Amino acid sequence: GIINDRETGRSRGFGFVTFNNEKGFGFVTFNNEKGFGFVTFNNEKSMR
């Protein structure tokens, strides 16, 4: 999801993404070279 400023409602310029498999992650990291920004990968599963 995209993170928004609480006061203005505008995007803060970053977000969080969850991948169900490595194929989706591979697609994003490949396209990162085309200017989608920085990608960080954490392979630990988190439960909320």
UniProtKB/Swiss-Prot annotation:
It holds the Pfam family RRM_1. It comes from the Eukaryota. GO terms for biological process: miRNA transport. The keyword Metal-binding does not apply. Keywords: RNA-binding. The keyword tRNA processing does not apply. GO terms for molecular function: RNA binding. InterPro entries: Nucleotide-bd_a/b_plait_sf, RBD_domain_sf, RNA-binding_reg, RRM_dom. This is Glycine-rich RNA-binding protein 2. It comes from Populus euphratica (Euphrates poplar). The lineage of its organism: Eukaryota, Viridiplantae, Streptophyta, Embryophyta, Tracheophyta.
